[in-house]
Amino acid sequence: MKVQEIHKLLGNHSQGTYIDIGAFDGIKVNNTKYFEDIGWVGIAVEPHPTSFAKLESNRNCIKENIVIADHDGVSEFNWSDDAPMTSRVDMSGQKERIHDMKDVVKQQLPCMTLNSLCEKHNITQVDFLKIDTEGYDCHIINSIDFKKLHISFILFEMWEHHEELCYKLAIEKLINNSYLEVTKDYDIAFNDRFNRYFLKS
């Protein structure tokens, strides 16, 4: 789904708030730059140090060099300059993917939940949330307190072959919080390769 289609679903508003979790350099394979360019405000989160340095110079939004997790504190982050877009939080079920990376650095990074990030920046309404954390997306969704944070549109990657139960619970949680999965024709139950799109009804 093109970002312009998402914007249309959100009413083509000229003002809004986005959060980009796993922003990489803020340019490549990125769909929040569009919203920044039309005047929206937001936060871009990228734990990979080399990618974050590029993000700092590429974007004008708030930038956070942290891990978004299912808890506040510290998290082990595995990264490599050999594959910066596939670095990830260390967790069970992802070990084989970490081993595929060369020259892996294991680093302890500060982490917080999405709710804590939004509280830090006094955000209660998010119009567009993008999550791309190479297999950790479902954990982030399952940790969101939707009673405290209103999110209009959520885009995330689906790695169900690694975390089948986690993603099942995440989708159930979204449905139970009045989200509908969006298709190219704006119906439900469309899987765009790895990406899943949910709109608050």
PLM feature spans:
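Phosphate/nucleotide-binding beta-alpha loop and adjacent structural elements of enzyme active sites
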Residues: M1-S201
